[in-house]
Amino acid sequence: MCPCPLHRGRGPPAVCACSAGRLGLRSSAAQLTAARLKALGDELHQRTMWRRRARSRRAPAPGALPTYWPWLCAAAQVAALAAWLLGRRNL
């Protein structure tokens, strides 16, 4: 019978989607997503910092946030998805 609390013994562990192999795949997918998110954040930081250093004595440009807003939204959605996947793994 399946030992996971989600299925409460409804079938053999080999049939359960929560088997160790599946959890390992979810974990590696979440880690891959986290690595991609970190790379995206590093690239975004690099793109904004060289501009900030180039015009450090001038006023900040108001158009910088609308330029990167889609990237920030995408990064937030990916982070939420990774957190959701990790939360489901700990059930």
Swiss-Prot record:
Compartments where found: Membrane; Mitochondrion
InterPro entries in alphabetical order: Apoptosis_activator_harakiri (IPR017249), Bcl2_BH3_motif_CS (IPR020728)
Bilayer topology: Single-pass membrane protein
GO aspect biological process, one term: positive regulation of release of cytochrome c from mitochondria
Motif (BH3): 33-47
Transmembrane intervals: 69-87
Pfam families noted in UniProt: Harakiri
Record keywords, A-Z: Apoptosis, Membrane, Mitochondrion, Transmembrane, Transmembrane helix
GO cellular component term of the entry, any: membrane
Domain notes: The BH3 motif is required for the induction of cell death.
Function: Promotes apoptosis.
Assembly notes: Interacts with BCL2 and BCL2L1. Interacts with C1QBP.
PANTHER family for this protein: ACTIVATOR OF APOPTOSIS HARAKIRI
Name of the protein described by the UniProt record: Activator of apoptosis harakiri
